[in-house]
Amino acid sequence: MIWKRHLTLDELNATSQNTLVAHLGIVYTRLGDDVLEAEMPVDARTHQPFGLLHGGASAALAETLGSMAGYLMTRDGQCVVGTELNATHHRAVSQGKVRGVCLPLHLGRQNQSWEITLFDEQGRRCCTCRLGTAVMG
């Protein structure tokens, strides 16, 4: 297991109360040895005006996953802040849920890079993101 902080899924989900994460319906669903996953509904909260998943909602899911994964890689007295987010949208999604899978690309002392891939309910890749974070403290 790569994580320096040891939290349960319930503890991770509790951090979302009264935040954008909760408003969008994002729920952490898996914390594996080197992976963090979450789901987000594709509904009125996350649609753009034409009834499709809003790219900003996809970006919010990606940044949520990458930032939390980054936090799990810090020690007491440290935190992470996002420095760059890149998202490539591959496929439109109009309903159901999307699942985000976050994996590390680089875990340095001062910066991290995360790859977050979003999948629709049929397991098709709909968005690929990369998040850079800086370790503070």
Curated annotation (Swiss-Prot):
Which CDD domains is this protein grouped with? PaaI_thioesterase (cd03443)
* Keyword line: Cytoplasm, Hydrolase
What Pfam families does this protein map onto? Answer: 4HBT
| GO biological process annotation, one example | enterobactin biosynthetic process
MF (Gene Ontology): 1,4-dihydroxy-2-naphthoyl-CoA thioesterase activity
Q: Which GO terms describe its cellular component?
A: cytosol
Q: Where is the active site?
A: 63
User: What EC number is given for this enzyme?
Assistant: 3.1.2.-
- Name its cellular compartments: Cytoplasm
Q: In which pathway does it act?
A: Siderophore biosynthesis; enterobactin biosynthesis
Q: What does this protein do?
A: Required for optimal enterobactin synthesis. Acts as a proofreading enzyme that prevents EntB misacylation by hydrolyzing the thioester bound existing between EntB and wrongly charged molecules.
Oligomer and partners: Homotetramer. Dimer of dimers. Interacts specifically with the aryl carrier protein (ArCP) domain of EntB.
Q: Which family does it belong to?
A: Belongs to the thioesterase PaaI family.
From the Swiss-Prot or TrEMBL record, give the protein name.
Proofreading thioesterase EntH
Q: Coding gene?
A: entH
